[in-house]
A protein has these predicted regions:
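N-terminal low-complexity, acidic/polar interaction/targeting segments
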Residues: 1-168
Length: 168
């Protein structure tokens, strides 16, 4: 898959997010994916200050994403709207034709086990996130309501992680 290095952002499965892309390798990756209507593989950089990352500058777990919309801006950069599909892990990554190409394996999500431990952890997670949201004051009540309505545990964890202010 064409691979897009990201700085200071992680895209999770089921997340829809606009990205601003300006580096030639990144634009080439988008163009390659769109030419074949393929998904793109999004990998966070280990150090976001690295201007021209190599394969060793990228994390090994990322997100396979669908490109929903592309808008070329007058300054030569591209605004792209992506939706995370599933988590993936790099098997191999190489630089070819001015872009990164990755062979990716799917990362298995944990099945929703029907046991009391999982349910207790889920309740604790929701309570802790609610407290975090009250302290943070930047998370709207509708987001909290949406999160409380998510039944799938993997999706719940990804959605909460997407709303936390964490450093990579």
């Amino acid at each position: 898959l064409a691979t897009l290095p990201l700085r200071d952002v992680v895209v999770y499965p089921h997340m829809v997010l606009p990205l601003f892309v300006g580096r030639p390798k990144s634009i080439a990756a988008l163009e390659a994916a769109m030419a074949n209507d393929d998904p793109v593989f999004l990998l966070a950089q280990i150090d976001p200050n690295t201007e021209d990352p190599t394969a060793s500058d990228l994390h090994r777990t990322g997100t396979v994403a669908q490109v929903l919309q592309v808008l070329k801006l007058p300054d030569g950069t591209v605004k792209v709207l992506v939706e995370g599909i599933r988590r993936g892990r790099v098997l191999t990554i190489e630089e070819s034709g001015g872009l990164f190409l990755s062979h990716v394996e799917a990362v298995n999500e944990y099945a929703d086990a029907d046991n009391s431990d999982i349910e207790a952890i889920r309740r604790t997670l929701l309570t802790q996130f609610d407290q975090y949201a009250k302290l943070n004051k930047k998370i709207p009540a509708e987001i909290i309501n949406t999160i409380n309505g998510i039944d799938d545990n993997s999706r719940l964890v990804d959605t909460i992680a997407a709303h936390l202010q964490l450093k990579l």
